[in-house]
Every structure is written in structure tokens, then in C-alpha cells.
């Protein structure tokens, strides 16, 4: 029996037939060749960058829209077009989930300009900043920085510093022309800025509305055509996947469902994706927003969530900290910072109980089920 099982596993690993023509088509970072339904937003982005191509200053923009509405893809597409047109504009896309510090942001800008990262030690931030701005001034190049998920810079309390450093550079370095595309889903974003930043960051608002059902179906069908060989999945099954995608409100869920269905069908040595593969995929896939957020957490933050989920009930901060300290050895101040971050990311809620010192004892409440968390990669 064990020998048969080993042969089954070996067959799966060595099987050289595939349903996938291009598995990358189902990756979260994939930029499709056929990018539809965002022509007006692309035009608005182009209008913001156009002055930089004419030796002027780019127009700042706030790019608003819920998750998976095409914001990131639109920016990457327009940046590719600009860079293929002119060397006079540096277009730098930065994922603020991954880079949350002032040094991290400007290291990405430095890398974009010079082709390599600056030294991580021994070089002060001021020198890196000066090198960037002197290059822009001497080469007469404009800089446009897209700060994707800029809310993470607000959590790390670096948003105002970063925006100030970019947008007021011309006051110190004559001739420098800079602009920022701030990408987020919070329409109240600009009101969180310091006055000295708010006075210079007067952005155009570019809104990415949710896709309609017809648009979602067509986008998923485009991915199917690129990612699978012909005949792998029927339009009827794609309609069902579209319905589930609309229920979640997140296009990434549908794209991920296609990938999981394809993998399950391959494991069964099936030439097509069937109803049974979709049913199994639905049971194995967690909420897409939770999955994408959890991917950005470090190991201590994930351990915090594991402990809270394993408890099976709401916990006081004190009780959770005792378990967290035993597991990680972290200090209470680190524990508190994790609470603040996870609450900011809407993974947990907190509620004062009125007990404890000065009545500040807190109950920690997860905003997800244990089962959903367990279905996230890394748990």
C-alpha cells in the first residue's frame, strides 16, 4: 500500500503533461498584455505625467479604488509606456507593504536610477538622498514615484516624511522635478497629512470603480486564454467562478480559483477542469483579502494570530501576551506594536473592558475564523 502511494506521488511530480500554457497568468503580480476597461484612468495617469515629458513638473495624483480594481496594473502599464518613450523621466513603482521606512523607499528610488541598491550600513540617509537629487538635477530628469498601498507608510508613521522629502526636493536642489502617485482605498487619505505636506500635495483624484460582472467574466476569460490550453475549462464553469468572484468583491479570488482548479485537475490527471475540481478549490481557498494581508506579516505577527485563532474565543491582551511571550520571548512593547498594526490592517478588533489599571484592560477579537486563517499559505 505504501509503495503504491509513493508511486502515485512520483507520478504527480514527474508527470510532464500540463493544462497550463502560462502559469504566470494566474500570479498576483502578472501584468496582462490585454488590459481592458481602464482606458479613462490610463488617460488620466498619462495627463499627470505629460508635463514631465515637456521639462515640467509631474502632477501629483491620488489613485483610489478597492482591492483588485486594476490600479497597480494601470500604473505599471503607463510607466512602461513612459520609459519606452523617454529617458528623461524616472518612473519608480514601490510596494509600501514591503518597504515601510524612509530608507527603504529611497533605496528603491536609488536602485531604479543607478541599477543597484545603496549600501545598507555606513552611508547616512542624507547622502543617499543627496545622490538621488543631484543626479536628477544634473541629468535634467523628472521623478515620478508610485507609492502603492501607501496606508502602510501611515502605519509606520513615515508617510509625511517620505512625501515631504520627495515633493519639496526642488527647494534644496534647483531644477529637480518630482511627483507622487499615492495608491490606496481610503478616500479620506489626504486629510491625514501634515500641513507642510498638504500645502504642496494637491493631487488629482483618479478613481477605479469596481468591475461589473460582465467585465469580471471577460477578464477571467482573458486569463484562461493566456494561462490554459484551449478546452481546459468550459464557459459554464467560468460563469460559476465569476459568481463566486462577485460574491467576494475581489478579482484576485477568481484568478486564484482558476489556478487552484487547474492544479487539482492536473493532480487527477484530468484533461479538463470539472465541477468536482471547483468544489474542492472552494473548500481549500481562504478569503483573498486575508491571504494577501497575511503574506505581508513577519513571523511574530503570524504567531500572534495563530495563538488568538487557536484560543477559539476572544482573549484579554494580558492572557494573550503570556502565551505570546512563552512562544516568542518578545517584550510587551513589541506585543503592543503588533496589536496596533493588526488592528490597523483590520485583522483584529479591540474593546476596552473597563477593568484593570485605569480601566484599560482590552479584549482582542479576531475578524476572521480559525478555519480561514488555516487556509492561508504559511499557516
Curated annotation (Swiss-Prot):
Transmembrane segments: none annotated. ATP binds at residues 69-73, 211, 223. Autophosphorylated on a serine. Phosphorylation is inhibited by binding to MCM. Both single-stranded DNA and double-stranded DNA inhibit the phosphorylation reaction. Changing residue 148 to N: Retains some ability to be labeled. One of its GO terms (molecular function) is ATP binding. Keywords: ATP-binding, DNA replication, DNA-binding, Nucleotide-binding. It holds the Pfam family Cdc6_lid. Changing residue 71 to E: No labeling with ATP. InterPro entries: AAA_22, Cdc6_C, Cdc6_lid, ORC1/CDC6, Orc1/Cdc6_arc, P-loop_NTPase, WH_DNA-bd_sf. Gene3D superfamilies: 1.10.8.60, P-loop containing nucleotide triphosphate hydrolases (3.40.50.300). It comes from the Archaea. The keyword Glycosyltransferase does not apply. GO terms for biological process: DNA replication. PANTHER family: CELL DIVISION CONTROL PROTEIN 6 HOMOLOG, CELL DIVISION CONTROL PROTEIN 6-RELATED. Belongs to the CDC6/cdc18 family. The N-terminal AAA+ ATPase domain and the C-terminal winged-helix (WH) domain are both required for DNA binding. Involved in regulation of DNA replication. Dissociates the MCM complex and inhibits the MCM helicase activity, suggesting that it may function as a helicase loader. Binds to both specific and random double-stranded or single-stranded DNA. Interacts with MCM. This is ORC1-type DNA replication protein 2. The gene is cdc6-2.
Amino acid at each position: 500500500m505504501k509503495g503504491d502511494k509513493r508511486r502515485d506521488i512520483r507520478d504527480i511530480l514527474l508527470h510532464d503533461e500540463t493544462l497550463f500554457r502560462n502559469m504566470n497568468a494566474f500570479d498576483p503580480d502578472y501584468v496582462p498584455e490585454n488590459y481592458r476597461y481602464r482606458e479613462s484612468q490610463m488617460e488620466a495617469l498619462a495627463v499627470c505625467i505629460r508635463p514631465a515629458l515637456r521639462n515640467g513638473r509631474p502632477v501629483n495624483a491620488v489613485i483610489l479604488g478597492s482591492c483588485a480594481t486594476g490600479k497597480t496594473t494601470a500604473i505599471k502599464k503607463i510607466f512602461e509606456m513612459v520609459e519606452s518613450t523617454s529617458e528623461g523621466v524616472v518612473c519608480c513603482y514601490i510596494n509600501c507593504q514591503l518597504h515601510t521606512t524612509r530608507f527603504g523607499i529611497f533605496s528603491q528610488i536609488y536602485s531604479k536610477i543607478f541599477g543597484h541598491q545603496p549600501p545598507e550600513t555606513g552611508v547616512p540617509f542624507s547622502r543617499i538622498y543627496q545622490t538621488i537629487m543631484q543626479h536628477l538635477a544634473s541629468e535634467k530628469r523628472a521623478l515620478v514615484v508610485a507609492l502603492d498601498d501607501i496606508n502602510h507608510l501611515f502605519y509606520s508613521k513615515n508617510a509625511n516624511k517620505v512625501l515631504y522629502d520627495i515633493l519639496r526636493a526642488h527647494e534644496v536642489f534647483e531644477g529637480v522635478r518630482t511627483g507622487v502617485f499615492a495608491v490606496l482605498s481610503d478616500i479620506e487619505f489626504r486629510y491625514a497629512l501634515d500641513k507642510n505636506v498638504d500645502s504642496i500635495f494637491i493631487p488629482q483624484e483618479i478613481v477605479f470603480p469596481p468591475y461589473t460582472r460582465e467585465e469580471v467574466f471577460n477578464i477571467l476569460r482573458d486569463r484562461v486564454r493566456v494561462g490554459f490550453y484551449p478546452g481546459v475549462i468550459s464557459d459554464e464553469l467560468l460563469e460559476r467562478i465569476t459568481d463566486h468572484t462577485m460574491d467576494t468583491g475581489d478579482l484576485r479570488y477568481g484568478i486564484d480559483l482558476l489556478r487552484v482548479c487547474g492544479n487539482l485537475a492536473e493532480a487527477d490527471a484530468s484533461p479538463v477542469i470539472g465541477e468536482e475540481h471547483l468544489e474542492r478549490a472552494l473548500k481549500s481557498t481562504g478569503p483573498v483579502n486575508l491571504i494577501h494581508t497575511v503574506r505581508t506579516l513577519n513571523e511574530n505577527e503570524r504567531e500572534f494570530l495563530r495563538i488568538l485563532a487557536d484560543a477559539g474565543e476572544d482573549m484579554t491582551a494580558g492572557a494573550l501576551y503570556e502565551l505570546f511571550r512563552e512562544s516568542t520571548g518578545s517584550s510587551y512593547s513589541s506585543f503592543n506594536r503588533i496589536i496596533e498594526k493588526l488592528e490597523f490592517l483590520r485583522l483584529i478588533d479591540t474593546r476596552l473592558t473597563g477593568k484593570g489599571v485605569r480601566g484599560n484592560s482590552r479584549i482582542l477579537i479576531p475578524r476572521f475564523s480559525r478555519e480561514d486563517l488555516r487556509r492561508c499559505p504559511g499557516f
